[in-house]
Amino acid sequence: MIKNYEIFKANDLSILDLFKLSIQKTIKKKYKKFNGDLSQIHKFIKKKNINQIRLDAFNNLNNNLDWMKLLKKICLDNLVKKLGPDIMVQTKLNLSIQIPNDETSVLDMHSDCWSADSPFQLNVWIPMTNAFSSNSMFIIDSNKSLKYFKELSKSGKNQKLIKPKVTDFVNVNYGKYLIFNPSLLHGNIKNKTSHTRVSLNIRFKSYFSPEPSLRNSDRKFGTYYKNFNLTDNTKFGINYIKTGLIT
């Protein structure tokens, strides 16, 4: 049975600081009084403006930062251990901001497979602030998740959602990151702490994992995924196929 999740220390904290600095600069550009503490964003930005600043920071991260190169320095070694050396990555780096008492940022319990994602992928979740208690996310263990999926498959109806326990919430401080299979049931609740949680997340899967079916054709290589790390042998094989000798 797979581990529910694993937490790792970032290989180089200065790399994480580059992601953090990018977000801070985006906020500071629009909100001059912002003091740089991402966990206190809610004291400087109104709730109605949070999503727009998230989108601005998202665009800045994806367009102006060599994030793939940076991620390789942070977590490639652990991804290779889990997926092998030939890896694809989601085309965009995702950014989440969950301020205290904001119900609009609640993401109910779900499996990413329900929105047609691959069950073979892994999610790397990188908090830009300390993530704890209700400002973090919960992950339901693999045994309970699979039991729920089997019951759902048999009945064909929505099952009663599993209520997360306190122990289901992950505690990950800045400087560390978490790897989990997002097919597991997971989500978040209203942030009842006094701290905002800011986090990055992105999906990875093996280059040799099954390609999407018609059900999830938009999750295929070239649209949803791109190459992240390939061995020389795999690169040669790809180039051989491109010659047209293999149909």
Kindly give the residue locations of the regions a language model identified:
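Short, solvent-exposed loop/turn segments at secondary-structure junctions
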Residues: 95-102, 113-114, 130-131, 144-145, ...
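A short coil-to-beta-strand element that immediately follows conserved catalytic motifs
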Residues: 85-94
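Catalytic core of non-heme Fe(II) oxygenases with the double-stranded beta-helix
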Residues: 105-172, 213
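Broad gene-expression machinery/nucleic-acid interaction feature
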Residues: 92, 121-125, 197-199
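Conserved double-stranded beta-helix
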Residues: 144-247
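N-terminal auxiliary "cap/dimerization" subdomain that precedes the catalytic jelly-roll/cupin core
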Residues: 1-83, 243-247
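Active-site periphery "cap/insert" segments of enzyme catalytic domains
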Residues: 69, 97-101, 108
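Short N-terminal helix-initiation segments at or just after the protein's N-terminus
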Residues: 60-72, 123, 142-150, 205-208
